[in-house]
Amino acid sequence: MARKQGDSESGKLGNKIYYTWHGRQCERSMPTSVANPQTEAQQAHRSNFAMVSKLSSYMKEAHLIGLHWHAIRERNSTYAIFRQLNKDCFTPDGEINLPRVIVSRGSVEQVEITSATIDNGVASTGSAGIPFTVTFDSRVYGGKATDEFFLFVYYPALCTGRLATPVPRSSGLVTAILPEEWLYPAEPTQTGTNTLTHSSKNAFPLHLYAFLRSTRGRTSDTIYIPLPKETR
C-alpha cells in the first residue's frame, strides 16, 4: 500500500510502485503478466521427468540391484541415478524409448543372449504362470563363472515387470515364470455363453533387460532385447 509522506508517496498501489529518488517523486509499473511464460520445451521437460519418475518405480526391482554400485559411487539413490541416466530416453512423439532404458551400469563383462523362448502351453488352473526361458553364451571372457545373471521382464501394457531368480554366468540359461495374461491376453467370445479364450494375437511386446553382478557387487551395463508379440 502506498503511503503519503509530505508531498510524496511511497509504496505499492495496484501495479504502480511509488518512491522518492534524490528528492524527486518517481513511479514505475509492474508487469501484469509473467515476463517469461513456461515454454513448450519446459513443459515437455516437466512431462518427461514425470514419466521417467514413474518408470523408475515400475522398474525398481531391476535398478535397485543394477544401479546400486553406481549409486554408491555417486552418493545418490538408485532412483535419482535412474532418472538421470534415462532423462533423454524419449521418442520424437514424447513416448519413452524402452530399448534405450538403462537399468544397470558398470564394467563387468557382458554376455550375449542367444534365444528367448516361451512354453507354448497355456498355464493350467492354479499354476504360478508360464515358464519363459532365456539362454545366453556362458563362456567366460573378461568376467567370472560365479558372476550372477539377472533378467528383468517388463510388460508395458500393465506398467509392471518381474525379476527372475538370478543364476550363475556359467549356467547359460535362466527361467522366469510369467503371468498367463502377459503372454496370452484373454478375449471374450460368443459360444452360447460368454467365455474367455486366450490368444497371442492380443498380446503386447515384452522388453527384456539383463545384467551381470560380480561377487563384489559390481555390475555390467544393461543388455536389452525385445520380444515382439509376433514371436509368441
Functional labels for PLM-detected ranges:
Residues 1-116:
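Long, polar/Ser/Thr-enriched low-complexity segments
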